[in-house]
Each structure stands twice: as structure tokens, then as C-alpha cells.
A protein has these predicted regions:
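Catalytic or ion-translocation cores adjacent to nucleophile or general acid/base/metal-coordination motifs
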Residues: 2-34, 149-161, 322, 328, ...
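Helical "lid/coupling" subdomains associated with nucleotide-phosphate turnover
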Residues: 2-201, 205-246
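N-terminal low-complexity or amphipathic/hydrophobic leaders
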Residues: 42-56, 61-64, 71-78, 299-351, ...
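C-terminal non-catalytic interaction/assembly regions of soluble proteins
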Residues: 151, 158-280, 547-691
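Glycine-rich oxoanion-binding loops at beta->alpha junctions
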Residues: 338-383
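Core active-site phosphate/anionic-ligand binding loop and the adjoining beta-turn-alpha structural block
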Residues: 434-518
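Oxyanion-binding "anion nests"
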Residues: 507-570
């Protein structure tokens, strides 16, 4: 619960029963523990739950004359005054002690999962089952049981607010998205008032505008408004009589059919984040140190790639699932340092092309692998030596690991890429900065049988423009493989050690989750990438506006972030580094990736606090994870992080021409370096065993 009295909203990534869902909801962690939890006594241990007698507690619990030992019986045996205490006097002290210890461990674990800060916090216990909770809980400063705690649900229902929801699809040909959004907001407010809310108390709880994929000039707008109940609201007897008490009783008296369900067990081994070491071994044939990727590595790489994606590159989640399943099937994935390549190596590189919004709703197939096979056939290459990423940001950062796995080509991935981040086009690569003409010949594949090859061009930009048009016709998502490259060009022109950087950022997020320091994960990432001279916290606040539209295979739009009042913050001591901007709002336009961060002060003055080619990442404050364009949502608390780009972009006028704000259509924005770049440390070389 926040100081404002409202529950804390779940992060941008919401899971129910381990399944990710795209709904906004309060942050809830559930465990199988309550007053009806069944207690079983064994020779060496006592278990509590997760099965329960449920609503039969008053007849099946021993203190009520039943024959099932429950958590309530344990509480009564320990001194609580519920039911008939004499009915549990035969429960041994050992059973009570072990059961209470088990209950305490379960409660402490779920409390720890809810915290985003290691500091002790007060805990409010409500509900009938709260009587079984311990009075002293680790990590808790105070345990509070308010009056009427056993009927908290009824109290909550009595004071709940009245809501109004609007979900409409509108044509943007004759009206702007802003006009449509304002219309939806007003409709939501009017519906809340019509439902019985006081108009002067109504506020907007959620606003989201989403362009419809594959349909021109259509946008879906959702608006939800809530307000306090008005006692002056009039309800007819007919409306009240529409609810049948008899029907209600009949529904709730039905006995649910119990089905035997297998437990879902995550086969991932439990890893100590603080002591984990990547598996780097020397190849017995070549002597080259090779990093064999594990499930833990894949998880950290996916998180780190999304941060480096600057909201673009596509969500890496589906690619993470693919890589995880490849590893579980017994295949191997290898990464090597750039210095380990041979001068004669043929290096294939590529990735996905298309809108991140489309990639969020459409699972990838083998588009990139198929495009590589098409180009290999055209160039008459039987295979290649090394795989490389187009961009480390987003899902594309994981593509070379997929195609290089032993399931496909069984080739190592080099620890480098052509961007050091994510960009919306293929010509915005460092190889195009220093050696134009390296994109063709290239191949495109849709994953469903369609493919094409482009053999010649007059400039690099036309390659992306032509293939982007084809991409739109092929479903707005394809795989692309560009002209193979060499070791010399990788060493000279690429951004090195970016796979290592993604892994280290992902480790920061995992470590923050373990130690309940997710609210300061931005500071931990800053320390990892080189310190406050290399990266900065730009802003903290809440997303209050999201605009999106699809055009020519790109996601365009802007988010607005507002600094929030203290009563909406979970902890006043959440930050470690001072933010670059405070007060007012921060506006971030995007074209697949975030372009710049403009601070609009309360007096209306504006200042660009960061822009491309520097990296601008929007992190979910609660989880510490990166938000991409598809995850931008009204009401999410965020931290905006800026990271200095590689000098491959900023050292030459050509680099700024291709990767700067002018290339994104903002010629009036002048690039000012955020700080000094520090090259990431190679994971392969750091953890390589001695030869």
C-alpha cells in the first residue's frame, strides 16, 4: 500500500500463475496458506498446505468438531481463542512449533517477494486467516492487525469507487489521436458519473492508445475513470430486482469438481546471483576460450538486451523461450571474443526487420535463419565461420545465438555488434559509417515461404527503404541477412563486447531482484557501465501519456512522463544518484527506439537532456526491467536511464549524420554527449581459464 492509501500497481510485467498477461492490476503475490490450510505431521517434518479445507473450515477443523488438522487448529493450540480449545489439547508441542516455523517461513518469503527495498517495512494483516500469521516477521518493522481485520473484504467493497470504461476503435484519417483520446477520456468520465460517481472526484486510472496492426488509420483507445460513490445517485427498484438472491445462492452452493492436476515445476536450477560464474572453457582443438551459454546466461542476456534496445529491437521474451528450449533439448550455444577470430573467417550477420508492436503480438519463426540460407545459396557458401548480431538491442541481440546454436549452424557468436544499441534501420550501423556499401547482397525471408534477394544499390539508405516496403507487404516482420563481413572490419568498425555488456546489465537486474533493490537498479547499471561519468538517471516519474502509430514498418509515437507526488512513491529514499531533471514532465518521442528526452519544466521552458546516438532506456521502477514500445502504458512508474554511446557514433560527423537526431527527422536537435564512453569488459576473457 502506498502512502496515498491506494494499493501499489503491479509492474509493467504482470504474471498470473506464472503466465505473463497484458493487464493492469494491483501487485498481488499469492501462496497456498490460510486458516484452512491442512497440516500434515510426518516422522521428520510438518507440512502446511498448500491444499485447504476452504469454506468447510467451520465443520472440518478440529476446533470446530471436525477431524482435519488445520493451520487454525495450530493457532488455537498456540494460544488463540477460536472454537473449542480442548479439542486440540492433544496436539504435541513439537507439532505446534514445527508448524508455526513453517507458517513463518512461508509468510516471510512472500513478504520478501513484495518488497522493492531491503529496509524493514510495516505489514498490515487482514482477513480471517490473518490469525495464523506470526507476530514477528523478518524484514518487517511492525505487524498491524486493524479493527475489523477479519471482514476486510466487506469493508473494501463498501468503500470501493465507481468506474467507467471506454474501449473504442476510431479512424485517424479525419481526426488526430489526441482528439480521439480526449473523446474517450470524456466518455469514460461520463460513464463513471452515470454509474453513480461524484463528478468532482472522478480521475482517470488508465488511458492507452494502440494502433491496429495490418489496418490503415485505425487506432484502439481504452480509457478507465474512477470516482467516489455519490449517495445522491438514483437507482430504480427494477434495477435492484434484476439480481436474484436465489440464483446467486444456487451458483455459490454448487460443489466444484476437483481434478487432479500435476504440479508445474520450473526445471531451472536455483542460482546464487552473487557467486555465479559463466562457463568459459578452452576449446581442446583450437585452444580458443569459448563461453558456453546456460539458461541463467540467456535470462540475463535477454534482460540486458532489452535495456540496450532503448525501447526497440523487439521484445526478447519469445527469443529467450526459444533459446531456453534449445538448451533443454541438449544443444549448445557458444560466444567467443573478437580477438579469437581468424583473419579468414566468414562472418554472417543479420536480424529481424519490422515494427516492435507487431513483434509483440506475432511470434517469430525461423526468419533470420531462412534469410541466411537464402544468402548462402546465392553466394554459394556451404556454411560460415562466425555469427554476429546486427544490433545488441532487443530481440535482435539474441538472433546470432539462435542461428549459431548446434540446433542450426553450430557456429560461435562473436562478442560484438554494429550498433551498441538498437536503431530502426539497417543503414544506421557503424559499418555504414566507416565503409558504405556493405549491406548488399542481402536476403529477406518472411518465415512462411517468401524470400527475396537484393543484389545492388547506389546507397545504403535505399536498401532499408526498399526492403522495408517489402517487409510491410510480407507481414511487417521478416528476417534479413546482410553481406558477410570479416574479422578486420569487425575489429575496426563494430562496437565490441556488447554481448558481455548485455549480460552484465541482466545480472544487475537479477541481483536487484534478489536483494530487493529493484528501485535502484538504474544506479547499479550505471556502476556497471562505467559510473556516473558514463551514464545518468535522467528522470523519475509516471507515464501519463502514450501515443503510437504504425507507418512503413515502424512504430512512431511519444510518451509523456510526469514527476509524481511523494504520496505516490513507495520509498522516499529510493534513489542513489541525483536525476538530471526534476519537476515538470519528460517527453520521449520514438521511432521504434527512443530518440531524445525533452524536459518541460513547470514554467514551460524546455531542455533536451539526452538524445541519440546516446542510449535512452525507460525502466520499470518496480521490477528494474526495461520497457519497450509495446509495454509503454499509462500509470506505470518508470526511471529513465541515459547511457553514453560508443565513440564509433560520436567521433565523426558521418557517425552523427547517420546515428544522430537529424537522421531521425529532428534536424533542430543538437547532440551533446551525455558523458564518456567506457568499453565493456569481455566476459570471455575475464572468466577464461588459463591455457
Amino acid at each position: 500500500m502506498l502512502p496515498s492509501g491506494f494499493p501499489r500497481q503491479a509492474s509493467a510485467y504482470v504474471e498470473v500463475a506464472g503466465v505473463k498477461i497484458n493487464f493492469s492490476m494491483p501487485h498481488v503475490e499469492s501462496i497456498g496458506l490460510g486458516g484452512g490450510s491442512i497440516v500434515r505431521v510426518g516422522d521428520s517434518e510438518v507440512t502446511v498446505g498448500p491444499d485447504s479445507v476452504g469454506h468447510y473450515l467451520s465443520t472440518k477443523a478440529r476446533v470446530f468438531g471436525g477431524d482435519v488438522l488445520t493451520a487454525t487448529d495450530i493457532s488455537v493450540a498456540a494460544g488463540q481463542d477460536i472454537g473449542t480449545k480442548d479439542l486440540v489439547k492433544d496436539v504435541s508441542l513439537r507439532t505446534v512449533t514445527l508448524a508455526e516455523a513453517k507458517i513463518k517461513a512461508l509468510v516471510e518469503r512472500v513478504v520478501d517477494q513484495m518488497k522493492t527495498s531491503p529496509e524493514p517495512l510495516p505489514v498490515l494483516l487482514v482477513g480471517g486467516g490473518s490469525v495464523i500469521a506470526p507476530k514477528i516477521i523478518a524484514g518487517v518493522s511492525e505487524v498491524i492487525q486493524p479493527p475489523f481485520h477479519s471482514v476486510a473484504n466487506a469493508v473494501g467493497a463498501a468503500i470501493s469507487k465507481i468506474g467507467g470504461t471506454v474501449d473504442i476503435i476510431q479512424n485517424t484519417a479525419e481526426q488526430t489521436i489526441a482528439q480521439i483520446t480526449e473523446k474517450a477520456k470524456q466518455m469514460a468520465v461520463d460513464r463513471a458519473v452515470a454509474a453513480g460517481a461524484k463528478r468532482d472526484t472522478v480521475t482517470l486510472a488508465e488511458v492507452d492508445a494502440m494502433p491496429l496492426q495490418y489496418v490503415v488509420n485505425q487506432v484502439r483507445v481504452i480509457a478507465r475513470a474512477v470516482g467516489e460513490f455519490s449517495s445522491d445517485a438514483f437507482y430504480s427498484d427494477a434495477a435492484v430486482n434484476n439480481f436474484s438472491a436465489e440464483d446467486d445462492d444456487e451458483i455459490y452452493s454448487e460443489e466444484s469438481v476437483k481434478q487432479s492436476q500435476a504440479s508445474i515445476i520450473d526445471p531451472r536450477p536455483i542460482v546464487d546471483v552473487d557467486t555465479y560464474r559463466p562457463n568459459v572453457v578452452n576449446n581442446p582443438k583450437t585452444g580458443i576460450p569459448e563461453w558456453f551459454i546456460t539458461e541463467t546466461d540467456v535470462e540475463w542476456l535477454a534482460e540486458g538486451c532489452y535495456v540496450l534496445g532503448c525501447a526497440g529491437g523487439g521484445s526478447p521474451f519469445s527469443e529467450y523461450i526459444k533459446l531456453r528450449d534449445i538448451l533443454r533439448a541438449g544443444h549448445t550455444i557458444r560466444v567467443i571474443d573478437s580477438s579469437s577470430m581468424k583473419d579468414s573467417d566468414v562472418i554472417y550477420w543479420g536480424g529481424h526487420m519490422g515494427s516492435p508492436a507487431v513483434s509483440n503480438e506475432r511470434l517469430s519463426a525461423n526468419e533470420t535463419e531462412e534469410s541466411m540460407r537464402e544468402l548462402m545459396e546465392y553466394l554459394r557458401h556451404d556454411s560460415f565461420d562466425v555469427a554476429m548480431s546486427l544490433e545488441i538491442g532487443g530481440a535482435n541481440g539474441l538472433q546470432p545465438l539462435l542461428v549459431g546454436s548446434s540446433k542450426h549452424f553450430d557456429r560461435p557468436t562473436v562478442d560484438a555488434d554494429w550498433m551498441g544499441r538498437a536503431y530502426p534501420t539497417y543503414w544506421q550501423t557503424t559499418i555504414c559509417v566507416y565503409e558504405p556499401g556493405q549491406l548488399v547482397p542481402c536476403a529477406l525471408a518472411s518465415g512462411d515461404g517468401k524470400a527475396m534477394i537484393m543484389t545492388k544499390t547506389t546507397n545504403d539508405e535505399i536498401v532499408d527503404r526498399a526492403l522495408r516496403a517489402a517487409c510491410t507487404e510480407m507481414g511487417s516482420r521478416v528476417g534479413m541477412t546482410a553481406k558477410p563481413t570479416t574479422k578486420k572490419k569487425v575489429i575496426k568498425y563494430s562496437v565490441l563486447n556488447t554481448v558481455s555488456l548485455a549480460w552484465r546489465i541482466g545480472r544487475c537486474i537479477a541481483r536487484a531482484k534478489k536483494h530487493n533493490t529493484s528501485s535502484t537498479v538504474a544506479e547499479q547499471i550505471i556502476d556497471e557501465v562505467g559510473g556516473p561519468d558514463s551514464a545518468k538517471v535522467l528522470f523519475r516519474g509516471k507515464i501519463i501519456g502514450v501515443e503510437r502509430r504504425l507507418w512503413k514498418g515502424h512504430s512512431y509515437g511519444e510518451i509523456t512522463i510526469q514527476q509524481v507526488a511523494d504520496d505516490e512513491l513507495e520509498s522516499a529514499s529510493a534513489s542513489g544518484y541525483k536525476t538530471v531533471a526534476t519537476g515538470g514532465v519528460l517527453k520521449i518521442p520514438f521511432k521504434n527506439e527512443n530518440i531524445y528526452a525533452k524536459h518541460v519544466k513547470d514554467d514551460g521552458t524546455e531542455d533536451i537532456v539526452a538524445c541519440v546516438p546516446d542510449l535512452i532506456a525507460v525502466l520499470d521502477t518496480q521490477s528494474g526491467k526495461a520497457l519497450g514500445v509495446p509495454e509503454y502504458r499509462y500509470g506505470v512508474m518508470v526511471t529513465v536511464l541515459g547511457i553514453t554511446c560508443s565513440p564509433r557514433w560520436s567521433d565523426t560527423p558521418k557517425g552523427l549524420e547517420i546515428g544522430g537526431p537529424a537522421a531521425m527527422g529532428y534536424k533542430d536537435v543538437v547532440y551533446k554527449p551525455l558523458g564518456n564512453y567506457v568499453e565493456p569488459k569481455s566476459v570471455v576473457l575475464e572468466y577464461a581459464p588459463p591455457k
